[in-house]
């Protein structure tokens, strides 16, 4: 009889502890807005386009990012990876897929960044965001192309909101 009573008490207690343990990570993984603006330069050595830019964004503060994509100039698409660096050095790593609408003076570029990892407070980060940017067709004196734009989406990270 005592064994049955103990089992009847321990089972609900174990269920409560397990529920609480599983709820803590779920609560810590809250989605938060991720947005900002940037400007920089694109260096094109076909088929590779390398972007280096600086800007400001939520969760990142002052930021820098580098991106390297392989472009398909026949259909104006690209794919590659990017590295976003926050003011304190914490990083977000993404894969990139995008497309461009060509024009005589500018290309209008839209890219989807999917978070693949991070460091510091972005360790364990997940999510995606969209980059909308303008690429100036005429090169600058140094041979690079000016680019500027914005990004918006959501990020889920155990410590991103802190």
Pin down the residues of each PLM region.
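Bacterial N-terminal signal peptides that target proteins for export
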Residues: 2-14
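Bacterial N-terminal signal peptides
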Residues: 12-23
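Beta-strand-enriched cores of mature, soluble protein domains
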Residues: 27-162
């Amino acid at each position: 009889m005592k064994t049955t009573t103990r089992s009847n008490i321990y089972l609900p207690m174990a269920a409560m502890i397990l529920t609480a343990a599983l709820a803590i990570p779920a609560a810590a993984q809250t989605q938060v807005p991720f947005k900002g603006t940037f400007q920089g330069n694109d260096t094109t050595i076909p088929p590779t386009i390398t972007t280096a830019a600086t800007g400001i964004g939520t969760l990142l503060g002052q930021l820098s990012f580098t991106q390297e994509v392989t472009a398909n100039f026949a259909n104006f698409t690209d794919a590659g990876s990017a590295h976003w660096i926050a003011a304190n050095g914490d990083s977000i790593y993404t894969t990139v897929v995008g497309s461009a609408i060509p024009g005589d003076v500018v290309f209008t570029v839209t890219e989807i960044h999917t978070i693949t990892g991070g460091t510091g407070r972005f360790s364990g980060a997940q999510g995606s965001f969209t980059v909308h940017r303008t690429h100036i067709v005429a090169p600058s004196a140094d041979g690079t192309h000016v680019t500027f734009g914005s990004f918006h989406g959501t990020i889920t990270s155990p410590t991103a909101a802190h």
